[in-house]
Amino acid sequence: MPTQKAEATWHGSFREGEGKMRLGSGAFEGGYSYRSRMEEGPGTNPEELLGAAHAGCFSMSLARRLEAAGYPPERVHTEARVRFGREGEGYAISRIDLRTEAEVPGASEEVFLEKAEAAKRDCAISKALAGVGEINLEARLVQHAE
């Protein structure tokens, strides 16, 4: 199995400093700061990138499960909302809400929801985030326009 790489550099104090995060593939490099993480400042933050990773992993896991059941999806779109804040003397992710919708010709709502729950439980990022208090899922099957 491949090993993926990412890196981050931080310069300065917690509140006044700034940094850059970069993916090993070179597909993304972005700045982050106290303001981008704790307020609504410009830039990205670790939780936003974690949300993107979770949404991507979940979408692929759901597509794999649907295809294995005989219903290859035309499209899966997932949004992850990551709740992050103070916990004790530090910070923690307390909750992740996944919202997904998919166009899956021929799939019933029951099959779709079963596969979505399994993908939420078993995708690699969900497993890595086992310490998060809640990972919730809202899934919607979009009817394919004929």
PLM regions and their residue ranges:
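Extended beta-strand/beta-hairpin segments
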Residues: 1-52, 56-146
